Design a protein with these regions (language model features):
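Polymerase palm active-site segment centered on the conserved acidic dipeptide of motif C
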Residues: 254-258, 347-349, 357-429, 440-443, ...
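A short, polar/acidic, helix/strand-boundary loop motif
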Residues: 310-335, 538-569, 577, 596-609
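Catalytic-core region of right-hand nucleic acid polymerases
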Residues: 166-330, 420-468
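C-terminal reverse transcriptase regions that engage the nucleic-acid substrate
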Residues: 394-510
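Reverse-transcribing Pol proteins
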Residues: 43, 52, 56-249, 253, ...
Length: 707
């Protein structure tokens, strides 16, 4: 069934009703450009993965699903206006807060103190709760006590309140019914004050910022924002100086990384007597996030915003839009992390208001209860959004920060929602036209994030970052380089192909924990050749296993910009030989005098495009053999004289090396690998790159199968 309206479409392509305000799904059904993209990608997948069973019809269904997911989150101003349904403030809307202001003798600071004292009795962060739940030796005990009085809006010493409101923003005026309705909801919850504008204008020390609005994925109403950065007259509350003051007051924010989350899960796995079968993951949300904090009464006069209809709003609890809020709330997050981990049997990490936990199955109930008790004990009885608490008992997997972690199989991948949005983003960009810097940064961010579980595509990120490097105006559009176009094409191909082949992007959780190295690759390169020695580590000692001198079969004409890439190719050749000799699932330390190539090898992150061919080859080798670089050692050039000589054409025999340790210079596999790494060969067209990539995969596949 399809129901259309003047402002949007309800479409049900996959037996579910999807809100399609931007007409994305309808566009796909009617737009030849989308259909053409599907056909092109299907053909390229067939070339790149000849054994794949991908067909246009199956590909189309995945793209439609991506469009459907994007449509669900593709709300716009009109969507918010429809949600507001013509809302206007009740005639007496300011009466409650005006009466409270009268009780405070017209003093906004006193008014805030009175209302905060009343709210404390309802159960919020307070000095009594801190003393009752947090030990005095906690590193953030004093900071937490300061927060009980509220977050201070820190400003430079020369800051002066502007005393009059800026002009209403055009976007706010367009969606004012939605913004006002959301502020009204906050008013009913006791989170903001609504007062007559004329009363605030008569007060001294009032600072005005702009009410603003933005979209929010999955929320038709969007999100109302206190824009503390907008004041064309100068003196905005958000500033680099204010951010620095916040860091000095609250400390640096250190959010958990995916490696930290996986490490937590692995530690529970090691506690389990039944492997993954006895590991359970769970999550819990704090309700309201920043609104769980008060604004310090002395700072409340700085948070006024003019609305329509003679009404103005003043924040007296935490808000979205202030550069100070994340740092202040992180104090609470840090304390909760320590307190919860001290009482539960498993372990948790926390990202702002998202608590993520891991434990054994029999510990789940008690850990959830203990976690809840800590949160409500510190922040009040309503601090936990109980309806959002979930675990893996029923499904075996859970979404943590956009990652789908499956403890039934012990794997991690992109969450379904994030996968579809990334797929939509890469498909939606029109590579034949100029592309906004903002869009390029989003694509680069997706590529960087998701290459964590799709190792083969890690070389396909640097060109996207390079496109927007140094550009501050995110709304500027630019013509894409050939390398960036290839990157976008390859991400389209892999996102689709990996999904349709069944497993999608998945990585074993246990691969995040790396063992001590089994081999050391010592290397050096010149612009004319490569030298490396491979040592096997046995009982803590390095034993020379192989040594090689390889001539470059291409001429770089002495151009020094190729030096880093040549150094890196030595690492590729050494790994190629290890894999050719049947080594699998081993870890390696790389040692050399070139910092850049050491960094590329250990981080699998690359800068520039000269190394792309070599990077594709190495990542293909490592992925196929389950091998990893786990350490890097930088040595001085004078300590690397053997490999330096080897790279300049001196043969191992001339240095006193004979027999089996010497790698045959006519090794055909290494010669073919070197040919594919050639930095002079470019693949600026997608067909060329697909052929190159397919050739790399065939060569690596054959080498792995033979040994």
């Amino acid at each position: 069934m399809v129901i259309t309206s003047a402002t949007g479409h309800y479409l049900d392509p996959e037996a579910r009703q999807v809100w399609d305000p931007g007409g994305l799904l309808k566009d796909f059904q009617q737009n030849a450009k989308w259909e053409n993209k599907v056909r092109i990608v299907a053909a390229q997948i067939a070339e790149l993965f000849p054994d794949s069973s991908v067909h246009v019809e199956r590909l189309g269904s995945v793209v439609r699903a991506a469009l459907g997911e994007a449509a669900d989150g593709n709300y716009n101003e009109q969507s918010a206006i429809e949600w507001a349904a013509g809302f206007s403030f009740p005639a007496n809307i300011c009466e409650r807060d005006s009466n409270l202001l009268d009780l405070a003798d017209g003093d906004l600071v006193v008014m805030a103190k009175l209302s905060h004292e009343a709210r404390e009795n309802e159960g919020r962060l307070s000095t009594a709760r801190v003393h009752a739940t947090v030990p005095r030796d906690d590193p953030d005990f004093e900071k937490l006590l300061i927060l009980c009085d509220g977050v201070q809006i820190l400003v430079p010493k020369d800051f002066t309140p502007n005393t009059t409101p800026p002009l209403l923003r055009n976007k706010y005026k367009r969606v004012c019914t939605a913004v006002n309705k959301m502020f009204f909801e906050g008013y009913l919850e006791g989170l903001v004050y609504l007062l007559p504008t004329h009363r605030l204008l008569s007060m001294s020390g009032i600072h005005w910022s702009s009410a603003h609005w933005t979209t929010k994925a999955g929320k038709q109403k969007g999100r109302n924002i206190g824009d503390l950065s907008n004041d064309e007259r100068g003196g905005a509350l958000n500033s680099p100086e204010a951010k620095l003051l916040g860091q000095e007051a609250w400390g640096d924010i250190k959010h958990p990384t995916v490696d930290m989350l996986v490490g937590m899960v692995i530690r529970q796995y090691k506690r389990s007597a039944n492997g993954w079968a006895d590991v359970v993951l769970w999550k819990m949300d704090l309700k309201g996030a920043f609104t769980l904090m008060f604004i310090h009464p002395e700072s409340v006069p700085l948070l006024a915003m003019q609305l329509t209809g003679g009404v103005s709003m003043v924040y007296h609890t935490g808000l979205f839009g202030s550069t100070l809020m994340p740092g202040a709330f992180d104090v609470i997050s840090r304390v909760l992390r320590r307190r919860i981990n001290s009482v539960i049997k498993g372990e948790i990490e926390i990202f702002v208001d998202d608590i993520m936990g891991a434990c054994l199955t029999g510990e789940l109930s008690s850990d959830l209860k203990d976690c809840t008790d800590v949160c409500t004990g510190l922040l009040g009885p309503n601090a936990v959004a109980v309806e959002k608490t979930g675990d893996t008992l029923a499904t075996g997997h859970i979404d943590w920060l956009g990652w789908d972690i499956n403890v039934t199989k012990g794997i991690i991948g992109i969450s379904r929602k994030n996968f579809l949005r990334a797929l939509y983003g890469f498909f939606d960009v029109d590579i034949s036209k100029k592309v906004k810097v903002r869009t390029l940064q989003k694509l680069a961010s997706w590529a960087s994030r998701y290459s964590l579980v799709c190792r083969a595509l890690r070389p396909m990120t640097s060109a996207l970052y390079a496109e927007s490097s140094g550009m501050r105006n995110l709304e500027v559009s630019k013509t894409l380089s050939g390398e960036a176009v290839v990157c976008i094409h390859m991400w389209r191909l892999f996102l689709v192909a990996m999904e349709l082949e069944g497993e999608g992007y998945r990585r074993s959780l246990l691969t995040f924990e790396l063992e001590s190295p089994s081999f050391v690759i010592e290397y050096d390169s010149s612009l004319t050749g490569f030298g490396f020695r491979i040592f096997r580590i046995e009982y803590g000692s390095e034993l020379l296993w192989r040594i090689a001198s390889v001539d470059a079969d291409f001429s770089l004409r002495g151009v020094s910009s190729y030096q880093n890439t040549m150094e890196y190719i030595s690492v590729v050749l050494a790994f190629g030989y290890l894999i050719q000799q049947g080594e699998r699932s081993k870890t390696v330390c790389v040692r050399g005098d070139n910092v850049t190539s050491l960094k590329w090898a250990t981080t699998e992150r690359f800068k520039g495009t000269l190394c792309t061919n070599a990077a594709v080859c190495l990542l293909a080798l490592l992925s196929a053999s389950s091998m990893d670089v786990v350490d890097a050692t930088h040595i001085r050039g004078v300590e690397n004289c053997v490999c330096d000589d080897l790279s300049r054409g001196v043969r191992p025999e001339a240095l006193g090396y004979y027999g089996d340790v010497v790698i045959n210079g006519s090794n055909s596999f290494l010669k073919n690998l070197l040919m594919l790494c050639n930095p002079l060969t470019t693949h600026s067209m997608i067909k060329e790159f697909c052929r190159f990539y397919a050739e790399v995969q065939r060569m690596v596949h054959d080498a792995v199968l033979r040994n």
